């Protein structure tokens, strides 16, 4: 099936589409299912009486909440619906073919076994696997000293060895948004994030509202989380696939996954064309009469923040990477391990990609310095004394200044499109790029992808222009000025008249009568995505306005702070147009402004710059308009609506305005909700990865419902978490998650500078999508948050996020290596230092006095002076000043010379 045919099928059946409401119909009625209630110290659970699969899993502390879809148990009662307690097996005899068995496909009566002692329920479920199963499968629910455990014993009942090449345990949790309001979803549904870390792997199940308790699914011995396989919807799966579920998957329901213990047989078949798996696929063999027991344990953490402490309390190995698991080759990283078993060895896969050097321990944690070579994915495999192995997944990148340069060069050359005969006004343009085809995408039936608007079409030029905020390049700036003047103004954006400043949905559209012969006849142009010229010209989608506002605002900042770079217009023109875009949004696209918008933080910066420039009338009007939105959100319990049924893109802007207007309780709720879908996990792919699973439909080449790794939500949701950390530097977890998301957005950039929309995490893909798509929304988030952080943690000691740290003679210094080198937070001082011109080479902090010395790069043609702003962000922090420095527009203007210069900041 081609990508476009698959796209047609998916877009026709997806539950929620941009701008569309969920289709609702009368609910059918179902017969109730008999259940057996069970109590353990931590849970109130229920098993289906007929199958002994899990029908309810409520924490004892809150019995009205259910981690599994118990409310839908009756409608999910038939054959083909998987539950916790089911099993998937693929086996073969020596030299034979693989055969699949699934306990949920055609259920048969189970044979109950005696439940004595700590056993809560037991059954032989072999009959549900079918008559040809070479294995006897017994399942037991156990109360193991107060911990709920699920165990399967597999016994080879034949006279020949049996190889188990695939073994999966369905993990069915209530992540379903369908037919629920936002309030109901936040109260009733949960998210699941995996740590695919072999013997140290686990699942964390967190409630949408961010409150505790959280659920952890932990492996028993011999039950590694080797892979995390999506259980596909039966109606759409390949013929013969029985490892499926009949529940619909779509934007309102991600679906369920297998805890995959063995995956070799999948790797040989379904995953044969995929990229490298998280772990080497394995199988195991049972001799005649031999048995093996596998199992998982269910425990609760009192809060999401207490997950790591709960892992330690349950004798699980815990890894903490600083600053995370994305390691540029010029940065030092650290790995802290707290483990019940001594470390036997640490290996790099591939060999030499990572080195982990033991350092002095940190209050019960083993510490390693981690350095990287090369580029791309790598793993540290940590073997413990008992033979168990923990996998920590890393991503190695170029030094970030090189990555920034690569992105700017690629987007303004390989993605640059000029054609005076282009019938859609895309001349010049920066268009979506197809990495597989090696060319820009001039037509796609999802017309916005080729139309420079919507996220899927604006992403590439937004990335190119956002890169200039801290790393302006004269050649790139010259092209971007043309892009704004010749294409954005007048084509994408209405230039004058009653709708001046309004933004169209797409420049590209479908009109075969007007453009005969233009459209690819092999593509289906009959779905709703192939907008007419009228629909493409609609001004009512507010989500498109921040993209254009970013373009104007960045060029304002460059023109204001880097003399001679921007020549098309004075700085005031760009700031005026950023303001005009904002007010046009409120006038021409008011409906969606009731929601937080992706990249909506740009409006806060525009307002602040209007104030700094003394443009009082404009600032007053913009503040009035934004306060209307904020006051509306303040009345809602969960003000995170979207054009989707649930989304992770509106929260950052909601948080920003709550903070701006002093609505701290609402800001706190927003932060808590973000932490429900934005985890810290020892994997570059999941650490700081804001949950998203549907946007490949709208911005990717391969349109699938699939967990996306480092879609633009990762970096955008890092923005509020960074702010929250700077307000409370005692909460290291906030910084770890934020930095994971911010750096996650760099992994999308390949060695040439191409930037992918997101990584396909499903094991049959495991590679970056070939379309650049909506990546630029995330790169904007990286551009405004790129910074270095210096802190002294009570457990881990002095740490640097984004920079290398040295200590000497009572002083601590950090050499920033982040992608901007224009922002620095000194946590012990609570001081946030930002530069709008110039670069920070080094900062030295003297804890005894609080003095901070900045070493600034020498002058360049575009940076003859540095523009330095300082802000104390904590309640206990003291204000800082730079004596003798000239103050201009709220910051210090510091002349730069031919050699690096120093600026001393002192607390008052």
Name each model feature, range by range.
Residues 327-342, 856-858:
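Aromatic/hydrophobic beta-strand junction motif of beta-rich domains
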Residues 6-15:
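Bacterial N-terminal signal peptides
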Residues 22-250, 254-256, 265, 272-276, ...:
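Beta-strand-rich N-terminal accessory domains
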Residues 422, 426-439, 444-470, 474, ...:
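Catalytic domains of carbohydrate-active enzymes that cleave complex glycans
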Residues 177-181, 309-330, 390-432:
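Low-complexity, Pro/Ser/Thr- and charge-rich linker/hinge segments at domain boundaries
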Residues 341-406:
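Extended acidic/polar, glycine-enriched regions
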Residues 158-168, 306-309, 344-347, 865-868:
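Short, hydrophobic/aromatic beta-strand segments
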């Amino acid at each position: 099936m081609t990508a476009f045919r698959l796209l047609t099928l998916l877009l026709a059946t997806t539950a929620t589409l941009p701008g569309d409401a969920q289709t609702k119909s009368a609910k059918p009625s179902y017969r109730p299912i008999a259940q057996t209630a069970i109590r353990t110290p931590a849970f109130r659970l229920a098993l289906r009486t007929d199958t002994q699969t899990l029908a309810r899993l409520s924490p004892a502390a809150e019995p009205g909440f259910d981690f599994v879809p118990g409310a839908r148990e009756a409608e999910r009662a038939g054959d083909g619906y998987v539950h916790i307690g089911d099993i998937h097996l693929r086996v073969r005899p020596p030299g034979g073919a693989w055969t699949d068995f699934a306990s949920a496909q055609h259920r048969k009566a189970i044979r109950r076994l005696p439940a004595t002692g700590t056993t809560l329920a037991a059954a032989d479920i072999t009959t549900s696997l079918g008559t040809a199963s070479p294995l006897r499968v017994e399942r037991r629910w156990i109360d193991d000293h107060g911990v709920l455990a699920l165990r399967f014993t597999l016994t080879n009942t034949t006279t020949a060895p049996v190889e188990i090449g695939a073994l999966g345990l369905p993990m069915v949790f209530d992540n379903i948004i369908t037919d629920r309001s936002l309030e109901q979803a936040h109260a009733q549904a949960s998210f699941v994030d995996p740590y695919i870390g072999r013997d140290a792997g686990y699942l964390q199940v967190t409630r949408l509202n961010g409150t505790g308790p959280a659920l952890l699914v932990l492996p028993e011995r011999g039950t590694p989380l080797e892979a995390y396989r999506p259980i596909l919807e039966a109606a759409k799966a390949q013929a013969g696939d029985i490892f499926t579920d009949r529940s619909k998957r779509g934007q309102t329901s991600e679906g369920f996954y297998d805890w995959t213990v063995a995956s070799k047989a999948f790797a040989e078949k379904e995953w044969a064309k995929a990229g490298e798996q998280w772990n080497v696929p394995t199988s195991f063999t049972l001799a005649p009469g031999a048995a093996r027991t596998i199992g998982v344990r269910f425990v609760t953490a009192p809060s999401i923040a207490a997950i790591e402490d709960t892992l330690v309390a349950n004798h699980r190995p815990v890894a903490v990477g600083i600053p995370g698991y994305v390691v540029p080759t010029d940065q030092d990283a650290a790995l802290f391990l707290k483990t019940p078993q001594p470390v036997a060895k640490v290996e790099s896969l591939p060999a030499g990609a990572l080195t982990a050097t033991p350092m002095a321990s940190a209050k019960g944690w083993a510490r390693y310095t981690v350095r990287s070579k090369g580029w791309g994915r790598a793993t540290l495999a940590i073997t413990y004394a008992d033979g168990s192995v923990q996998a920590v997944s890393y991503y190695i990148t170029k030094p970030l200044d090189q990555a920034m340069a690569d992105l700017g060069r690629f987007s303004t050359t390989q993605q640059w499109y000029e054609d005076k005969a282009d019938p859609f006004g895309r001349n010049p343009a920066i268009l979506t790029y197809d990495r597989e085809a090696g060319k820009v995408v001039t037509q796609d039936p999802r017309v916005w992808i080729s139309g420079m608007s919507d996220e899927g079409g604006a992403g590439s030029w937004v990335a190119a222009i956002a890169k200039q905020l801290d790393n302006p390049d004269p050649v790139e700036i010259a092209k971007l000025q043309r892009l704004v003047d010749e294409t954005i103004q007048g084509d994408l954006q209405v230039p004058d008249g009653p709708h001046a400043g309004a933004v169209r949905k797409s420049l590209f559209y479908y009109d075969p009568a007007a453009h005969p012969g233009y459209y690819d006849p092999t593509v289906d142009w009959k779905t709703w995505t192939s907008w007419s010229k009228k629909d493409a010209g609609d001004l009512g989608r507010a989500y498109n306005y921040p993209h254009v506002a970013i373009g104007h605002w960045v060029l304002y900042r460059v023109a204001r702070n880097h003399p001679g770079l921007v020549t098309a217009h004075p700085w005031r023109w760009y700031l005026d147009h950023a303001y005009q875009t904002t007010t046009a949004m409120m006038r021409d696209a008011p409906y969606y402004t009731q929601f937080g918008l992706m990249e909506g933080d740009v409006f806060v910066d525009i307002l602040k710059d209007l104030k700094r420039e003394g443009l009082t009338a404009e600032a007053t009007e913009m503040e009035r308009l934004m306060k209307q939105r904020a006051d509306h959100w303040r009345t809602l319990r969960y003000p995170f609506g979207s054009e989707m049924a649930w989304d992770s893109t509106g929260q950052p802007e909601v948080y920003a305005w709550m903070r701006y207007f002093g609505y701290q309780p609402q800001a706190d709720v927003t932060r808590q909700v973000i932490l429900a879908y934005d985890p810290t996990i020892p994997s570059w792919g999941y650490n700081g990865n804001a949950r998203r699973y549907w946007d490949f439909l709208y911005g990717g080449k391969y349109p699938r419902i699939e967990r996306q790794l480092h879609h633009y939500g990762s970096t955008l949701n890092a923005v509020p978490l960074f702010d929250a950390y700077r307000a409370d530097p005692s909460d290291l977890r906030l910084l770890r998650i934020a930095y994971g998301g911010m750096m996650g957005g760099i992994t999308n950039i390949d060695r040439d500078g191409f930037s992918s929309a997101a990584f396909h995490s499903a094991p049959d893909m495991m590679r970056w999508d070939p379309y650049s798509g909506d990546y630029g929304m995330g790169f904007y988030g990286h551009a405004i948050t790129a910074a270095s952080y210096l802190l002294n943690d009570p457990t881990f000691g002095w740490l640097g996020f984004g920079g290398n740290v040295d200590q000497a003679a009572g002083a601590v210094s950090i050499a920033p290596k982040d992608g901007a080198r224009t922002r620095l937070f000194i946590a012990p001082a609570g001081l946030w230092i930002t530069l709008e011109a110039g670069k920070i080479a080094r900062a030295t902090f003297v804890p005894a006095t609080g003095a901070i010395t900045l070493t600034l790069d020498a002058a360049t043609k575009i940076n003859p002076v540095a523009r330095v702003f300082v802000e104390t962000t904590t309640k206990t922090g003291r204000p800082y000043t730079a004596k003798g420095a000239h103050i201009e527009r709220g910051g210090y203007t510091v002349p730069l010379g031919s050699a690096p210069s120093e600026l001393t900041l002192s607390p008052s």
